[in-house]
Amino acid sequence: MHTEADPTVWQGRVDAEEGALGQRWHQVVRSADAASPLNGAVALAGFACDAGIARNHGRVGAQAGPAAIRRMLANLPARPGRAIVDAGDVTCRGDALEAAQDALSGVLHGLLDRGAFPIALGGGHELAWASFGGLARHLAARSAQPPRIGILNLDAHFDLRAGERGSSGTPFRQIAEDCARRGWPFRYACLGISAYANTEALFARARQLGVRWLRDDEMDLLHLPRVLQTVDAFLADVDHVYLTICLDVLPAGVAPGVSAPSARGVPMEVIEPIVDRVAASGKLRLADVAELNPSLDIDHRTARVAARLVARVVDGVAPQGAAHG
């Protein structure tokens, strides 16, 4: 289920005449050797799974997302002094979603324990349950006090659906229930919500759980100062941040390769300043990008956007330490 990094995906242009400053990602990414320390390194972990999308009656194909993101990352310019490792993929076989989520949670937990900053590449947004699980296990082992974790989701959907089985539509409800069992606070903000893609039941559940949100029509450039104030207020209330980006938060013309394209969406001119603010906070512990479906993409638009957002996080985040109390 967990496979080592495939080095053949890391290929691209080589500008040898430019020296070290002309390097690209494919020239600097290394395999995450299980025996080596990772203090300060960015660690990519793929989640090749769309079983949660299938359970949520969406359009499948996101299982191929991690490889597509890596291919777009490969030719991006590398920044000097930043170590990047590839921790391989967790692949979901058939409908074995829970096993795949457990496996990814374990991979992320291990990367955090080794001092890395993990970025998970989806895959459906069911990966959020695994991402939170990995961070929760890491933090729970370091303090008897409930950690103040903030989940910031850039998404057109709350993903708070009810249901006996987990799916791409349930992860944050599952996290809320897990926090309640642990006696931890549930701090969740969802920015980019579409009023026409969430039922009244989901808005009611969000209010019941104390979720903070902004609608997509409140997130254009004219509203950017207020959006960043909302982000700052959220960051001030927490010690550890998990940033998750569902690509369907973007306009359909920018991100067509998703299961549920947005009729409106939030422009990159707003999404990127949010990412920058969170990455620079010193509190970001883990990030992921979800819902890329290459079979629905046009000219790799969505994959390119996903890679740009991953690189934006990498460029903005400070090197992580080995422990987060």
Swiss-Prot record:
What pathway does this protein act in? Answer: Amino-acid degradation; L-histidine degradation into L-glutamate; L-glutamate from N-formimidoyl-L-glutamate (hydrolase route): step 1/1
Give UniProt keywords alphabetically.
Answer: Histidine metabolism, Hydrolase, Manganese, Metal-binding
Residues that bind Mn(2+) 2, according to the entry? 155, 157, 246, 248
Q: Does the keyword Hydrolase apply?
A: yes
Q: Where are the transmembrane segments?
A: none
Cofactor note text = Binds 2 manganese ions per subunit.
Documented EC number(s):
3.5.3.8
Q: Which GO terms describe its biological process?
A: L-histidine catabolic process to glutamate and formamide; L-histidine catabolic process to glutamate and formate; putrescine biosynthetic process from arginine, via agmatine
* Record has Lyase as a keyword: no
Tell me the residue numbers annotated for binding Mn(2+) 1. Answer: 125, 155, 159, 246
Which co-factors does it depend on?
Answer: Mn(2+)
What's one GO MF term for it?
Answer: agmatinase activity
Catalysed transformations (reactions): N-formimidoyl-L-glutamate + H2O = formamide + L-glutamate
Alphabetical list of InterPro entries matching this protein: HutG (IPR005923), Ureohydrolase (IPR006035), Ureohydrolase_dom_sf (IPR023696)
- Role summary: Catalyzes the conversion of N-formimidoyl-L-glutamate to L-glutamate and formamide.
Family under the similarity heading: Belongs to the arginase family.
Q: What is this protein called?
A: Formimidoylglutamase
Quote the gene name from the UniProt entry. Answer: hutG
